[in-house]
């Protein structure tokens, strides 16, 4: 099986809580902190970087897949993840680059059973060169709307991953200016990155190729990997909420507006984790 060496000594853990954010030059105090977590395999990052600068063609660029989970539910966070797979594993799903790897069953998380997603989740974490998972709480969704919350999550997952990469390449006395990165966002639009902040780390806008991939989670392995991280991490928060509020049946509907969920809201009321800006919740509060 084609797998990477992976030891704990190579791993840098990443944890951030974002309470204030710069959006187009304006600082906004978030209604609730955005939590981000992840890790980087420093040894594999350096190996991929060396391959990156040894090849001048665009196909050698470091590829970051980005996807979200949970835009539609009435309850809980929207989760976003970014993931970097080994370059030999990163490409079109139809090319079967993962055929002989531990991630051979990886495809769009929506096409996989929950059992397979749960199986893939730790494997993606283990074999990814790096990943970041963001949890954007309902209060922030209500503050800036679900689209902007999703775009902000995509932006933060990308920027923090690039920031950590830049710091460690600079620490290893590597020329960061030779790094070329393709960021592949699932969907039909890309978030606006804070290029001013990235430039302070040595990452120029010309070094980043942002691409929007419609149905990218079913087309590209790196986006599919991010999809697994986002989906399973959100499911975990739903199961935790279900333990706290079993009467709502959250483990079954995961916060989506099913009949059972709407009946639970009518019977037991609106939870603090409900998205008050969403029409069904807003109507329940008004009634």
Curated annotation (Swiss-Prot):
<dbReference type="InterPro" id="IPR022898">
    <property type="entry name" value="RNase_HII"/>
</dbReference>
<keyword id="KW-0479">Metal-binding</keyword>
<dbReference type="InterPro" id="IPR001352">
    <property type="entry name" value="RNase_HII/HIII"/>
</dbReference>
<dbReference type="InterPro" id="IPR036397">
    <property type="entry name" value="RNaseH_sf"/>
</dbReference>
<comment type="similarity">
    <text>Belongs to the RNase HII family.</text>
</comment>
<dbReference type="InterPro" id="IPR012337">
    <property type="entry name" value="RNaseH-like_sf"/>
</dbReference>
<feature type="binding site">
    <location>
        <position position="68"/>
    </location>
    <ligand>
        <name>a divalent metal cation</name>
    </ligand>
</feature>
<dbReference type="GO" id="GO:0043137">
    <property type="term" value="P:DNA replication, removal of RNA primer"/>
</dbReference>
<dbReference type="GO" id="GO:0003723">
    <property type="term" value="F:RNA binding"/>
</dbReference>
<comment type="function">
    <text>Endonuclease that specifically degrades the RNA of RNA-DNA hybrids.</text>
</comment>
<dbReference type="GO" id="GO:0005737">
    <property type="term" value="C:cytoplasm"/>
</dbReference>
<dbReference type="GO" id="GO:0006298">
    <property type="term" value="P:mismatch repair"/>
</dbReference>
<protein>
    <recommendedName>
        <fullName>Ribonuclease HII</fullName>
        <ecNumber>3.1.26.4</ecNumber>
    </recommendedName>
</protein>
<dbReference type="GO" id="GO:0032299">
    <property type="term" value="C:ribonuclease H2 complex"/>
</dbReference>
<feature type="domain" description="RNase H type-2">
    <location>
        <begin position="61"/>
        <end position="287"/>
    </location>
</feature>
<keyword id="KW-0255">Endonuclease</keyword>
<keyword id="KW-0378">Hydrolase</keyword>
<feature type="binding site">
    <location>
        <position position="67"/>
    </location>
    <ligand>
        <name>a divalent metal cation</name>
    </ligand>
</feature>
<dbReference type="GO" id="GO:0030145">
    <property type="term" value="F:manganese ion binding"/>
</dbReference>
<keyword id="KW-0963">Cytoplasm</keyword>
<dbReference type="InterPro" id="IPR024567">
    <property type="entry name" value="RNase_HII/HIII_dom"/>
</dbReference>
<keyword id="KW-0464">Manganese</keyword>
<keyword id="KW-0540">Nuclease</keyword>
<dbReference type="Pfam" id="PF01351">
    <property type="entry name" value="RNase_HII"/>
</dbReference>
<dbReference type="GO" id="GO:0004523">
    <property type="term" value="F:RNA-DNA hybrid ribonuclease activity"/>
</dbReference>
<feature type="binding site">
    <location>
        <position position="186"/>
    </location>
    <ligand>
        <name>a divalent metal cation</name>
    </ligand>
</feature>
